[in-house]
Design a protein with these regions (language model features):
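A short, glycine/small-residue-rich beta-strand->loop->alpha-helix junction that serves as a flexible
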Residues: 11-24, 50-52
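A short, Lys/Arg-enriched amphipathic alpha-helix followed by its capping loop at the start of a domain
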Residues: 27-37
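A conserved catalytic-core segment of Leloir-type glycosyltransferases
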Residues: 45-132
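Hydrophobic anchor at the start of a short beta-strand
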Residues: 37-39, 90
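Nucleotide-activated donor-dependent transferases that construct or modify glycoconjugates
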Residues: 1-18, 43-45
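Short, highly selective alpha-helical patches that border small-molecule cofactor pockets
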Residues: 21-25, 29, 126
């Protein structure tokens, strides 16, 4: 029996590949799709992810979705692409404030220190994912 699955992650090869989570988050959706399930993945749209290289496209129904975070009204939007060499769809959650300034280390600054706002960044991401 086919299931509809929404898979949320912070890394997927080749878009964001920092830890062992990236290959895992690439393999699991691919395997589930090969088993006949309808799977969609969602990932933060980090500033270093090239829209041109990965052919990210606007998703009209995922534009400007309002949600509340820490008592503030926020707006979430997402773009879409596919994991290369698969038909697994990936939604990229956009936020200029939370994801745009990150370098390709994701969780750390260039000097190796863990970013102090990681907990808030991924709390925002989790809330936005549940709202889309």
């Amino acid at each position: 029996m086919s299931k509809k699955i929404y898979f949320s992650t912070t890394e997927i090869v080749p878009f964001a590949n920092v830890s062992s989570m990236a290959p895992f988050s690439t393999a699991v959706p691919t395997i589930l799709q090969d088993l006949g399930h309808d799977i969609r993945t969602i990932l933060p749209k980090y500033g270093f992810i090239s829209e041109r290289k990965y052919i990210l496209r606007e998703v009209i129904r995922l534009r400007e979705i309002p949600f509340s975070f820490c008592g503030e009204e926020e707006i979430a939007s997402a773009k879409s692409a596919f994991i290369p060499k698969t038909r697994v769809q990936v939604y990229f959650l956009e936020s200029d404030e939370w994801f745009q300034p990150l370098n390709n280390l994701l969780y750390k600054s260039k000097n190796g220190r863990v970013l102090m706002d990681n907990s808030m960044r991924y709390a925002y991401y989790s809330k936005a994912v549940l709202s889309t």
